[in-house]
Swiss-Prot record:
Subunit structure, as described in the record: Homodimer. Interacts with PLXNB1.
GO BP of this protein: axon guidance; negative chemotaxis; neural crest cell migration; positive regulation of cell migration; positive regulation of inhibitory synapse assembly; semaphorin-plexin signaling pathway
Stored PROSITE patterns: SEMA
Domain Sema intervals: 1-273
Protein name as it appears in the record: Semaphorin-4D
UniProt similarity note: Belongs to the semaphorin family.
Length: 295
């Protein structure tokens, strides 16, 4: 892809309350962005950002702090899937969630979604509203593609000032990126998730499973697999005896010998992705539902 995506949490600019409302974002820039010739000189001409939704609507639960993301790519997937680990803004809630987003849903928002503009009339707590006016051509924030080149816009330096001024004034999208299934893949009580990696595994019977490895702020690792239309935690491992936060989590690229590497302030731990030797009978192995293991 010719685009770069990055994730962060920021204070809401759309609304203003007594307490600061935090919003999880995904932003996008183009790799070949050279800035503008006059407007946005030596600055991004393609910067756009949108809200990431991770909520349980029927329970009015909002997970608005993003802690980590992982992009799952696989030949068995039609497109990359972005997994994000979220917690609520209020620390006393004691919940964590994992939401997944198709890359096409992200691109739909940036390439076809509505923009926002600063509110011209004071409307209680609302500071930004949907922009319903005319959108310049080429589309603001879009990367230089064949359509733009056909109009003689070869680089961002060629883009008209009207397009550049628009993206400078309207970097925020009105449309939000919604998760797969419109709800979290996993919600866990009494835990704060910090990092995530995801693997895609074909079991001995040919069934493909998504396996999530999620670390906690107490030095533990949860392993969850997809079956029966849901994610289920099948294993918990204590990685660090001092119950310290896991700050980095990596999955080795070698398919033959899969290992996880977890880092904290005190050190690094190497762990296998599965402990198959703990299942001493066929019944125990099947009951564990671990796609890495077979009897």
């Amino acid at each position: 892809d010719d685009k770069i995506y990055f994730f962060f949490t920021e204070v809401s600019v759309e609304y203003e309350f007594v307490g600061k409302l935090m919003i999880p974002r995904i932003a996008r820039v183009c790799k070949r962005d050279q800035g503008g010739l006059r407007t946005l000189q030596k600055k991004w001409t393609s910067f756009l950002k949108a809200r990431l939704i991770c909520t349980i609507p029927d329970k009015n639960l909002i997970f608005n702090i993003i802690n980590d993301v992982f992009t799952l790519k696989s030949p068995t997937l039609k497109e990359p899937v972005i997994y994000g680990v979220f917690t609520p803004q209020l620390n006393n809630v004691g919940l964590s969630a994992v939401c997944a987003y198709n890359l096409s849903a992200v691109e739909e928002v940036f390439s076809k979604g509505k923009y926002m503009q600063s509110a011209t009339v004071e409307q209680s707590h609302t500071k930004w509203v949907r922009y319903n006016g005319e959108i310049p051509n080429p589309r603001p924030g879009a990367c230089i593609n064949n359509e733009a080149r056909a109009l003689n816009y070869v680089t961002s330096l060629n883009l008209p000032d009207k397009t550049l001024q628009f993206v400078k004034d309207h970097p925020l999208m009105d449309d939000s990126v919604t998760p797969v299934g419109d709800r979290p893949r996993l919600v866990k009580r009494d835990v704060k998730y910090t990092q995530i990696v995801v693997d895609r595994v074909r079991a001995l019977n040919g069934t493909i499973y998504d396996v999530m490895f999620i670390s906690t702020d107490q030095g533990a690792l949860h392993k969850a697999i997809s079956y029966e239309n849901g994610m289920h935690i099948i294993e918990e491992t204590q990685l660090f005896p001092k119950f310290e936060p896991v700050q980095t989590l990596l999955l080795s690229s070698k398919k033959s010998r899969r290992y996880l590497y977890a880092g904290s302030n005190s050190g690094v731990v190497q762990s296998p992705v599965a402990f198959c030797d703990t299942y001493t009978t066929c019944f125990d192995c099947v009951l564990a539902r671990d796609p890495y293991c077979a009897w």
